[in-house]
Amino acid sequence: MEEKKVDLKDTLNLPRTEFPMKANLPQREPQILEKWKGLYEKIQKERKGREVFVLHDGPPYANGHIHVGHALNKILKDVINKYNLLIGKNVNFIPGWDCHGLPIERAVEKELSKKKIKKESLPKTEFRELCREYAKKYVNIQREDFVRLGVLGDWEHPYLTMDPKYEAQEIRELGKFFERGLAYRSKKPVYWCIYDKTAEAEAEVEYYEKEDPSIYVKFPLKSGEKFGIKDKKVFAIIWTTTPWTLPANLGIMVKEDADYVLVEVEDEVWIVAKELMDKFFETVNRPEGLVLETVKGKDLVGLEYTHPFVEKEKLKGHLSEETLKNMWKIYPSEFVSLDTGTGLVHMAPGHGQEDYVVGQRYGLEPYAPVSDEGRFVEPAPEFLINVRVFDANHLIVGVLKEKGFLVHEEKIRHSYPHCWRCKNPVIFRATPQWFIGMDIEFFGKTLRQRALEEIEKVKWIPEYGKNRIKSMVENRPDWCISRQRFWGVPITVFYCENCGEIIKDREVFERVAQLVENSEKGSDVWFELTSSQLLPEGYKCPKCGGDSFTKEEDILDVWFDSGCSHAAVIRPLGFQKADLYLEGSDQHRGWFQASLLESVGSYLEAPYKAVLTHGFIVDEKGRKMSKSLGNVISPQEVVKEFGADILRLWVVSEDYTEDVKLGKNLLKKIADDYRKIRNTLRFIIGNLYDFNPRTNALPFEKLHHFDRWIISELQNLLKKVHENYEKFLFYRVHNHIKNFVITTLSAIYLDVLKDRLYVYAPASWERRSAQTALWHLLIALTTSTAPYLSFTAEELWEHVGKLDPSLPESVFLYEMPKPDENLKDEEVLKDYEILLKVRDEVMRALEVARKEKGIIKHPYEAKVYIRGDESVESLLKKYEDYLNFFFTVSQVELREGGEVQIEGEELPVKVGVNKAEGEKCPRCWIYYQKEEFVGCVCKRCAKALSEMGIELNAVC
């Protein structure tokens, strides 16, 4: 019976792995999530006692599904946390949610309106319960979305700003501000939303383009005698884009040291700033009049005028005697600019921050005859009563025109503050509010001074963030912390009904905090219990001894809510401050600033060591994502089509410090990069199926020089990877890894290595050396990509664990290798720097031989001739025995020759190519002379077969 022949192909060590080529991420990732259940807790247990890295999560708002902005933010945080895990630290990451505030109130009101129920008809606590349930619902929805992205954290115990413990700590924090004299109540102008009927913080205001009337108005001076003008009426000319504020005008401001001109215009005299005169007359489309006199701003101070359409008599009984005495005069102000207008600025202390400051200086109260809904009320002129402010503009312009006080009117498009929730324009309106004073001293310094000092101690990434927040803190007004709404933490102060004293004792705050903490529904107790039930038993007013008290009805600004998170979340765990806060760049005026001011006011220090910001997401054309443009991409959609790892790879592929582009074409390109990386990792693990790193790995010094080269290059890569992870430059991490995988590994190392892996006997030195290098590569690449390609790294790790069962069950319980100088061969690195350049020249020559001359079809069909200068030639001689494998050709001779000849472009070498001599070995495909064959295969293959126990006659 004829003996069955062994197929030569079956004698090759071809790759074998169960790690699939097709990722199928959308289907595979949920299986990995199952495996990760309990991983965060296991890490906490195993890493106990290690250095802890604390990234404090800025709480997203518990409303709606997550969008790609949320995904970008949480993935960036996750990459940082996982890198810190992989360098051996313990990581504390407690996700949080912002649960109070107007958007939730609005959403609940909308639901109620469907049932024809008005919010006002429900008890406050019942409405608050509906808000609580709404927030819970979206916390759960968003939590699922974040977990699906592969974000690791304590998802079972997140912090919620509506949690009773959190609210109680917030009340204690508030108490400190009262105790230190930093919190006060005052009537002053604040941003006011007339649609939501509440005050707003600076951070809650967004600027959009708005069209408004731009008008120039004549205010008649009572007399021009100071300038010797008796026979003509003298007018101060003001410019405004908010005509609706004119009913509240109490003064005109000028720049003391600026020049002003008195200009004769027909039978009148107009006063404008000299510097703005030409521009003014051009704008109002009138010929310039005769300048009668030039005076300084200080010469105008004290002059009295009459209001174009408001009668003083009607204000009596509504305004204080002091205001009535000081109103309608010209006052000096440092806020007057000579950039636009006339240099004379209409002042309404009830409708502008700067106007208010000057008004306070000169005894003018913040008068604002406007209701919560933005409608004019008494004592505004009769024609305006019950009219909305923005609707009043054209009525006021009409009256000015009719009375002859309108100089000019046009339309202007300008940037105007809008409510971040309802997107409607807001107004500045003086109402009684609670404030935290930026310039009140405590412990020898003001809150502003301390905050600015702390900013200097924090690391800001990118650096421009420092100047941004610094200028905001330098210029910000006092912090308005009160809101006229239902769903939030109450401002827990009482008023004595007998003497009006504000009760703000520490023991009172502590008593309320304890009641809140011990109630299932937290701060609802404030609305459920009476003052006497909330106050300590037998409490008396410290001023008059009274025992009847009224509760404050306002609630706290949600920025104070989230600004307390360091005190409610980080400090109770024993951490003085977080290592890092990371949010979008809009949070310099939002959470970063609120947290800074709250922490400095409470603990005299910043709550963070470093602050990192990212940009916003735009489409591939750089446009903002919007439903109207149809360019919105949801993370859920990306995960469903591509998988979360593709979204994660997108995050690290971009420079997130700028605005980040996202679109389907970009995602396809990212998916293509992913495939290249995955296939390379698959090839590596596929060639380790018979390798036991514990018993088969060789020491570095005993490795083949080509393997020593790649491991040396790997140390260089690890150095760059660690450096850029530490600097949060993830796009550089990814670029370095991607280039290494695609260029250094796929195109060079692994391509050359195939011969050694496939042809030599499985346990040969040549193959074990190659496998040792592959093992180093596998561990380094799996761990260094794990922070961002988390699902893929974990999937791969399951296969890695089969090769070495002593490894931990998850890649995130292992440590990423650090660059090791003992695994670097500088001589080999230097040699290969030249050899690779020679290889490039050889590849170029082979391409000419294949494409242009048709001499060869495959590189193994080639014989290569190389001639170089002395230094190149001596290097080539050093590695002569390996050159044909390195160039993937059959033969190499160090002399001139060949049918195809090219001159080196980068090196002084000549490369020639001829068809290889001899015959092709059917097993390794390399050409040898007849005498180099044993039977039907070359001597090298014959040796390998012998070591494998395969007799030649079984294959030949």
UniProtKB/Swiss-Prot annotation:
Protein family (similarity comment): Belongs to the class-I aminoacyl-tRNA synthetase family. IleS type 1 subfamily.
Pfam families referenced in this protein's UniProt entry, alphabetically: Anticodon_1, tRNA-synt_1, zf-FPG_IleRS
Short sequence motif 'KMSKS' region: positions: 624-628
Keyword Ligase: yes
The protein's Enzyme Commission number: 6.1.1.5
Protein name: Isoleucine--tRNA ligase
Residues involved in L-isoleucyl-5'-AMP binding: 583
Alphabetized GO MF terms: aminoacyl-tRNA deacylase activity; ATP binding; isoleucine-tRNA ligase activity; tRNA binding; zinc ion binding
Subunit-level organization: Monomer.
InterPro entries (alphabetical): aa-tRNA-synth_I_CS (IPR001412), aa-tRNA-synth_Ia (IPR002300), Anticodon_Ile_BEm (IPR033708), Ile-tRNA-ligase (IPR002301), Ile-tRNA-ligase_type1 (IPR023585), Ile-tRNA_ligase (IPR050081), M/V/L/I-tRNA-synth_anticd-bd (IPR013155), Rossmann-like_a/b/a_fold (IPR014729)
Function in brief: Catalyzes the attachment of isoleucine to tRNA(Ile). As IleRS can inadvertently accommodate and process structurally similar amino acids such as valine, to avoid such errors it has two additional distinct tRNA(Ile)-dependent editing activities. One activity is designated as 'pretransfer' editing and involves the hydrolysis of activated Val-AMP. The other activity is designated 'posttransfer' editing and involves deacylation of mischarged Val-tRNA(Ile).
Top-level EC class: ligase
Cellular compartment(s): Cytoplasm
Entry note: cofactor: Binds 1 zinc ion per subunit.
Cofactor: Zn(2+)
Species for this entry: Aquifex aeolicus (strain VF5)
Binding-site residues, Zn(2+): 921, 924, 938, 941
Motif 'HIGH' region in this chain: 60-70
Domain-related comment: IleRS has two distinct active sites: one for aminoacylation and one for editing. The misactivated valine is translocated from the active site to the editing site, which sterically excludes the correctly activated isoleucine. The single editing site contains two valyl binding pockets, one specific for each substrate (Val-AMP or Val-tRNA(Ile)).
Coiled-coil positions: none
Keywords: Aminoacyl-tRNA synthetase, ATP-binding, Cytoplasm, Ligase, Metal-binding, Nucleotide-binding, Protein biosynthesis, Zinc
Gene3D superfamilies referenced in this protein's UniProt entry, alphabetically: 1.10.730.20, HUPs, Ile-tRNA synthetase CP2 domain-like, Valyl/Leucyl/Isoleucyl-tRNA synthetase, editing domain
Gene Ontology terms describing biological process: isoleucyl-tRNA aminoacylation
Catalytic reaction annotation: tRNA(Ile) + L-isoleucine + ATP = L-isoleucyl-tRNA(Ile) + AMP + diphosphate
Acetylation as UniProt keyword: no
Positions with a binding annotation for ATP: 627
